[in-house]
UniProtKB/Swiss-Prot annotation:
Catalytic reactions of this protein: L-arginyl-[protein] + S-adenosyl-L-methionine = N(omega)-methyl-L-arginyl-[protein] + S-adenosyl-L-homocysteine + H(+)
Species of the source: Rattus norvegicus
Biological process according to GO: chromatin remodeling; genomic imprinting; peptidyl-arginine methylation; regulation of DNA-templated transcription; spliceosomal snRNP assembly
Taxonomy of the source species: Eukaryota, Metazoa, Chordata, Craniata, Vertebrata
Active site feature: 144, 153
The protein's Enzyme Commission number: 2.1.1.321
Ranges for domain SAM-dependent MTase PRMT-type: 14-345, 358-684
Family classification: Belongs to the class I-like SAM-binding methyltransferase superfamily. Protein arginine N-methyltransferase family. PRMT7 subfamily.
Family annotation (Pfam families): PrmA, PRMT_C
Chief site of localization: cytoplasm
Protein name listed in UniProt: Protein arginine N-methyltransferase 7
Quaternary structure annotation from Swiss-Prot or TrEMBL: Homodimer and heterodimer. Interacts with CTCFL, PRMT5 and SNRPD3.
């Protein structure tokens, strides 16, 4: 059955109605899921297996039958481990229907159908009794309900319900315990992901300062955690202010509460500085003695950094304190971890832990609009002074006496740069109410409310009256739009340029003048694992899962690229970067598709895991900004990526299998096409052994 789905096209800006298979959202969820990554997480799998064996043995030693409840079974892997370890029966609960159906097939293929019952329900809907899903309560509780924040996938309510209704009072639990850790740091880089810094602009009259409104200064920020691969943040980017502090633990073998709580830990600062950021992670102990442990700690907090397990389904957390606060070395303070049933947040306090245990603080919520409009990388981008200087230098060469400027980018400070650098009049278009209000506040605090005109409408709908009857001599864009997911989605600027053509003066200049799409073939250190087939996992055949993911990838995105922040995922370039397509913003969008075909020669040995694509913008003939590679690759091919942007990754499936040979083809062929009518860029990359369609 087909269904019609409305979708806002991020490139053209139009609303499209697409005919989709009724299960299209299932396929996307499976295709972009972390199932493969979890199956490749050997440390996780081994520790779970060890913990399950120990739990089954403890129950058997009491002379009891081992009845296992596995919540969030996924592939059924943990249930199969339990039966292999000697469990008498397993009840495997999985709410996601396609996953539950796959688990049934995997369990059957591995010969465990007589000992594992897959229940396609949310665990809170599971019943116990003669006519229930379980005939009696289980005495072993096995779960994998955790995310990077530990509790973000509803672990606490699920455990709370299970202990009340589904398991025995003295049950064994795997994992047995989880502990959340925190470390207080000062970091200009990370703080720049949360607050707007004053921006300097060098003008002919000296330095001008763009200051943030007081509302942004006071705002506690976005309520959500920022989960990243913390191992890719250099220790030089932060100053440690505290030891690693165990903030709170959850014993999963006992009744768990999902009620809001606060846990305080007193510490003595290791250094004086500005307390700004809390780095946090957790570990899980699979047994009561804590001998079987799986940790998310970054390398500097590991006892043996050489044993570091890469994983993407569990990372580390960056939390921003509501306000930065000075602390003194040696002067005791308290760090408080607050949580409700799904979220964790932190505050810095002066009082003792005992006084804080009952102090519950409301979860911080953005009230300045900026954190709703700009995500963390966007804050970092706006705060990047080198980037601002780059745009300012380009603008100086473009501005002429009497310039009438129109700025088209979401929540951009380009309009302020244009004003300070001498534009006679500046208009800026903000499509959303949030960005309109935010920019009005920024202009007001900088005494620019009468100097820059903010227009709250979609740029395609601009009228001559909006521009006060004037013709635009300089059309500006970074370009940046909040709806963009892939690098080329910001080509929306070209569609805007085309729609406002009537408002441009003869000889009007557009900045950027042009854009280009670039690609390079890379070998990833680890990211390839998220799309790699597993085949066999701890002795269990999970090919059915591999096939399911492959089917969904073929259905949704076999020839699509996916956005990834590659500064978090090290890789080596195997080819030279290639310019694939060029887009001339001085001219309206052409009617005919733009195509490019070619072959990229591999210059370095390695596995061609995929092609990385990004955009570069030619601000002037002599000035270009890149959203991808920032510098030429080093001798070994190590890549340095723009940390403020996501790049697009097109995985080459033939090399993702760990058993694929290293000495593969020496070139990659490509075919890329830009479709002006839809704004889509279709692509195909193939190892030279294959032939492009």
């Amino acid at each position: 059955m087909k269904v019609f789905c409305g979708r806002a096209n991020p490139t053209t800006g139009s609303l499209e109605w697409l005919e989709e298979d009724e299960h299209y959202d299932y396929h996307q969820e499976i295709a972009r899921s972390s199932y493969a990554d979890m199956l490749h997480d050997k440390d996780r799998n081994i520790k779970y297996y060890q913990g399950i064996r120990a739990a089954v043995s403890r129950v058997k030693d009491k002379g009891q039958k081992a009845l296992v409840l596995d919540i969030g079974t996924g592939t059924g892997l943990l249930s199969m481990m339990a039966v292999t370890a000697g469990a008498d029966f397993c009840y495997a609960v999985e709410v996601f229907k396609p996953m539950a159906e796959a688990a049934v097939k995997i369990v059957e293929k591995n010969g465990f159908s007589d000992k594992i019952k897959v229940i396609n329900k949310h665990s809170t809907e599971v019943t116990v009794g003669p006519d229930g899903d379980l005939p009696c309560r289980a005495n072993i509780l096995v779960t994998e309900l955790f995310d990077t924040e530990l509790i973000g996938e509803g672990a606490l309510p699920s455990y709370e319900h299970a202990h009340k209704h589904l398991v025995q009072e003295d049950c064994e639990a795997v994992p047995h315990r989880a502990t959340v850790y925190a470390q207080l740091v000062e970091s200009k880089r990370m703080w720049s992901w949360n607050k707007l810094f004053p921006v300097r602009v060098q003008t002919g009259l000296g330095e001008q300062l763009i200051i943030p409104p007081s509302e942004l200064e006071r705002c506690p920020g976005a309520p959500s955690v920022y989960d990243i691969q913390l191992n890719q943040v250099s220790p030089a980017d932060f100053t440690v202010l505290s030891d690693v502090l165990p903030m709170f633990s959850v014993d999963f073998s006992k009744q768990v509460s999902s009620s809001a709580a606060c846990h305080s830990k007193q510490f003595v600062p290791l250094a004086s500085g500005q307390a700004q950021v809390v780095l946090s992670w957790w570990d899980i102990e699979m047994d009561p003695e804590g001998k079987i442990k799986c940790t998310m700690a970054p390398f500097w907090a590991q006892t043996d950094p050489q044993e570091l397990q890469w994983r993407d389904h569990w990372m580390q957390c960056v939390y921003f304190l509501p306000q930065e606060e000075p602390i003194m070395q040696g002067s005791p303070r308290c760090l408080a971890a607050h949580h409700d049933d799904y979220c964790v947040w932190y505050s810095l306090q002066r009082t003792s832990p005992d006084e804080n245990n009952s102090a519950y603080q409301v979860r911080p919520v953005c009230d300045c609009q900026a954190h709703l409009l700009w995500n963390r990388p966007r804050f970092g981008e706006i705060n990047d002074q080198d980037r601002t200087d780059h745009y300012a230098r380009a603008l100086r060469t473009m501005l002429m006496p009497g310039s009438i400027c129109l700025c088209v980018s979401d929540g951009s400070l380009l309009s302020v740069l244009a004003h300070h650098l001498g534009a006679e009049q500046v208009f800026t278009v903000e499509s959303s109410v949030a960005s309109y209000r935010l920019m009005k506040r920024i202009f007001k605090v900088n005494h620019l409310e009468d100097k820059i005109t903010v227009i709250n409408k979609r740029p395609e709908l601009l009228t001559s009256a909006d521009l006060e009857g004037k013709k635009v001599s300089l059309l500006l864009g970074e370009p940046f739009f909040t709806t963009s997911l892939l690098p080329w989605h910001n080509l929306y600027f070209w569609y805007v340029r085309t729609s406002v053509d009537q408002h441009l003066a003869p000889g009007a200049v557009v900045m950027p003048q042009a854009a280009s799409l670039h690609a390079v073939i890379v070998e990833f250190r680890d990211l390839w694992r998220i799309r790699s087939p597993c085949g066999d996992c701890e002795g269990f055949d999970v090919h059915i899962m591999d096939d399911m993911i492959k089917h969904s990838l073929d259905f949704r995105e076999s020839r699509e690229a996916e956005p990834q922040p590659l500064w978090e995922y090290p890789c080596r370039s195997l080819s030279e970067p290639r310019q694939i397509l060029t887009f001339d913003f001085q001219q309206p969008i052409p009617q005919q598709p733009m195509q490019s075909r070619g072959v990229m020669e591999l210059r370095r040995p390695g596995k061609s895991h995929g092609a990385v694509l990004w955009m570069e913008y030619q601000l002037t003939p002599d000035s270009t900004v890149s959203t991808g590679l920032m510098n030429p690759a080093e001798d070994k091919g190590d890549c340095c990526w723009n940390p403020h942007c996501k790049q697009a990754v097109y995985f080459l499936s033939a090399t993702l299998d760990p058993s694929a040979p290293l000495d593969g083809p020496q070139s990659v062929s490509y075919a890329v096409e830009f479709h002006p009518l839809t704004g889509d860029i279709t692509m195909e990359f193939r190892l030279a052994d294959d032939t492009l369609n």
